[in-house]
């Protein structure tokens, strides 16, 4: 392992933290994205309005501002609630929100909106006639979703999901501003102590590039999997 003036092991730990934040944020964003897409496609006006407000908020407010608002505002809100609950007992309780959890929730919340738009477009791209044909054959809604809608939806969604993941990966650098010791924060601390920015920032850039390269390979494999059979079908249609 490269020692990097004693900061090598800490940078490796920071890289693992960055990867954990990215993966967990992605999982949360995918869940929120599916819920948002379902709400936007719903005929229920309230669900549609809430989803529209959510995506508009995320598009209009910078990620860094949202990170600060959710972390510090959430901490203030939680402590206000505990003060109210324990007011009669004259107990002073102060709760610190974990930086890791705050980072995952914030990034997942931000990218849930973008994933929602990606999923919505992908669902709309699936031919509704195929869904009607599935119902005509007596298939349940769950089976139609699993066998017909989901595979075709993923075919259309994967390029957008891959792009969102790449942006999400780079956005994880923002967690350093709330005190989480990811590799960006550790590299910044090492730079401040040694006055050698390139010695630490270049390895950080290399790690991000490695993760991005592996991610591109995974997305390409998934696209190949979900595109099986569609090339031949397109040739027949032409």
Segments from the language model and where they lie:
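Transmembrane alpha-helices and adjacent helix-loop boundaries
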Residues: 1-238
């Amino acid at each position: 392992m490269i020692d990097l003036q004693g900061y090598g092991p800490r940078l490796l730990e920071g890289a693992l933290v960055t990867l954990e934040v990215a993966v967990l944020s992605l999982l949360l964003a995918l869940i929120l994205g599916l819920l948002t897409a379902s709400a936007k496609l719903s005929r229920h006006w309230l669900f549609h309005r809430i989803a529209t407000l959510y995506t508009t908020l995320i598009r209009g407010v910078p990620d860094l501002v949202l990170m600060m608002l959710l972390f510090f505002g959430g901490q203030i809100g939680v402590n206000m609630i505990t003060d109210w609950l324990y007011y009669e007992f004259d107990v002073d309780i102060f709760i610190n929100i974990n930086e890791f959890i705050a980072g995952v929730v914030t990034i997942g919340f931000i990218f849930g909106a973008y994933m929602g738009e990606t999923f919505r477009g992908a669902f709309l791209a699936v031919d509704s006639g195929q869904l009607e044909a599935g119902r005509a054959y007596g298939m349940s809604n769950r089976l139609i979703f699993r066998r017909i809608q989901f595979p075709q939806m993923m075919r259309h969604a994967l390029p957008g999901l891959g792009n969102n993941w790449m942006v999400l990966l780079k956005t994880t650098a923002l967690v350093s501003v709330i005190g989480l010791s990811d590799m960006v924060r550790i590299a910044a601390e090492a730079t401040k102590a040694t006055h050698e920015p390139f010695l630490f920032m270049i390895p950080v850039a290399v790690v991000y590039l490695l993760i991005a390269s592996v991610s591109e390979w995974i997305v390409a494999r998934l696209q190949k999997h979900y595109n099986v059979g569609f090339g031949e079908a397109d040739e027949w249609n032409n």
